[in-house]
Amino acid sequence: MTIELFKNQKHVFWTALLLTIFIFSAGILLGFLIENWRTSKIASLYQQSELDLLDIRIQNDIYSLSEIDCTKVIEENINFADRVFEDAKLLEKYSESSRLSNSIILQHKKYDLLRTSFWINSIKLKERCKTDYHNVVYIYDYQNPSLETEAKQDVFSKLLLELKDKKGNKIMLIPIAGDNNIISVDILMNAYGIKKEELPIILIDEKIKITNVENIEEIEKYLD
């Protein structure tokens, strides 16, 4: 009787162990597949970013020409801004769900370069064509935000999304990571007196810096 009981207990133990190993292995496999799916989505976005970077460099050359149709150029700039904005939302969605590997950080830098180039083009276009849109540049801490900074950035992001939905083409919303050690971004931050320890920060029309905000009205008052 005792031997049978021992055998049964041993059988239960091995069954439970095998079941645990199976569930654990299945969990790892599922996590691996999900991570691969996210990474492939991010890679797809960055392949498009390569084309966009080339496109925006050509746009920059076009703006230097003596004769351009401001109406058409402004329209295309707005369309490009909308695409960059939508891609930025997708990128953040996939990046937040993935581990910040060196590969993902490197790929994120490509989009930061794209957005920075777009920002410069938007400045030039405003000067050249006397446009009435506002550049709203959101510079944030990407790699190592503290819990306090992360919470603050969540508030900033939600308010800026709400502002973009409300203002539409009246603003060029340009999110850029300020801590990715990109020389061009660092130069611009220095030019506008923005320090990394101040992040996150909202820069409006290269003049107004906002470091604390609780509602969109506090941003809108600078857009009227």
What feature does the model see in each segment?
Residues M1-N135, P145, T149-K152, L161:
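Non-globular targeting/processing and membrane-anchoring segments
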Residues W119, D165-G168, G193, D224:
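Sec-exported extracytoplasmic/periplasmic mature domains
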Residues T131-Y133, D154-P175:
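Conserved helix-turn-beta segment immediately C-terminal to the redox Cys motif
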Residues Y138-Y142, G168-I183:
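Thiol-based oxidoreductase modules, predominantly thioredoxin-like and allied folds used
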Residues Q143-L147, N181, K209:
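Short acidic, S/G/P-rich loop/turn micro-motifs used as interaction or catalytic elements
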Residues D186-G193, V213:
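C-terminal regions of proteins
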Residues E197-V213:
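A short, hydrophobic beta-strand/beta-hairpin element that forms part of a small beta-sheet core
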Residues E214-D224:
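Thiol-/selenol-based redox modules, centered on thioredoxin-like
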